[in-house]
């Protein structure tokens, strides 16, 4: 490729990625030359500013027409821009959590934490704009490898080391399975470009090729199910969430999960809605596999909510809650239509606000008590009424109570499931039943906060970083719960 050709590309379309990459490089150099005894936490503010600028740059690119560069390996379209906004917002809020993370084994001398988190965020952004299997895989690995290191960054913690090891093993297996499925697609079509694959799979009318394509679909679904924590590939989630630092847990629960659904939607809708399925009506491979996806969604909702009932560790409880929410989103994928993409995006937006806000409060309480046990939430209303009300808002939204963004997200997916075909009525019923089950553990926390006496009588103050996260997330949860049209209008 000549220099003239390189200069002709519209590199300004990659401005957000360049900003995140440049910020990561600056932080790595600053960390290298800072004295060893210097507190590294102020680097979080530099990282936050970089991500905020990248977010503004992404908003500035919204009016731009869809364009692809680098031989269609990088594509900036409406899909990519919409999900990049979620990824950047989640990354920025996670960095604010990191600034005020103060356990005994904290991030005070871990400067690598901040640029590793930016590298993970960059990988997720590349996945959102990937137009080629190779680009997509590079982004996936950048996100995955950075996340493995972040999960075990507390090197002296045995729990963190154990969780990181489980994450590496499970993540490596899932990556191998995903790559194996991609290799089948490449073997059948002779190309790694996603658009070209979508055209080539339409020509696979031979039954033998269609069976191989179905195997590729299932292998990629299995591999990516690890990333989104769906049953039965969810086993790593509770241990990693509990062992990782709270900012990392929050990042994995929002940014990594969103990136997982980005790759699922980008690949499966583009490729497998065009692929024929032998002896099936309709003749799309994706639609012929909806029953399997629906089964995964139902099992994920049931198991996630059921096991969460017995948890005392708040991190493990939110881990199983995260699994259950993956099931709710999978309902939208099982009942797939073009309308459901908007519903999935809105659900991930709502989940970003309510989950990160809850993790900010959890971090403050667990840092003070040196434990994430549910009992430490007792009497929070007496110690900090505003913080208790904010946590109540997040819990109500996670439970799907009207007036919150979580309710709108669940309602849209529920109605979408009812509108597709009668077979999804069962899935919608499971969604309602498991949502009711979730009330038990969400309102169990609610009872601790408002109706149990506090062990500590001192006022609980919030550092500036955590306070910013709580305020922004509470406002977002209420605003999009009352006026959801703002988000949908912006998306359009």
UniProtKB/Swiss-Prot annotation:
The keyword Transmembrane helix applies. It catalyses: a quinone + NADH + 5 H(+)(in) = a quinol + NAD(+) + 4 H(+)(out). Keywords: Cell membrane, Membrane, NAD, Quinone, Translocase, Transmembrane, Transmembrane helix, Transport. The chain crosses the membrane at residues 13-33, 42-62, 79-99, 111-131, 133-153, 168-188, 211-231, 251-271, 284-304, 318-340, 344-366, 388-408, 426-446, 463-483. It is a multi-pass membrane protein. It comes from the Bacteria. One of its GO terms (biological process) is ATP synthesis coupled electron transport. Its EC number is 7.1.1.-. It holds the Pfam family Proton_antipo_M. GO terms for molecular function: NADH dehydrogenase (ubiquinone) activity; NADH:ubiquinone reductase (non-electrogenic) activity; quinone binding. Belongs to the complex I subunit 2 family. NDH-1 shuttles electrons from NADH, via FMN and iron-sulfur (Fe-S) centers, to quinones in the respiratory chain. The immediate electron acceptor for the enzyme in this species is believed to be a menaquinone. Couples the redox reaction to proton translocation (for every two electrons transferred, four hydrogen ions are translocated across the cytoplasmic membrane), and thus conserves the redox energy in a proton gradient. This is NADH-quinone oxidoreductase subunit N. It comes from Geobacillus sp. (strain WCH70). The gene is nuoN.
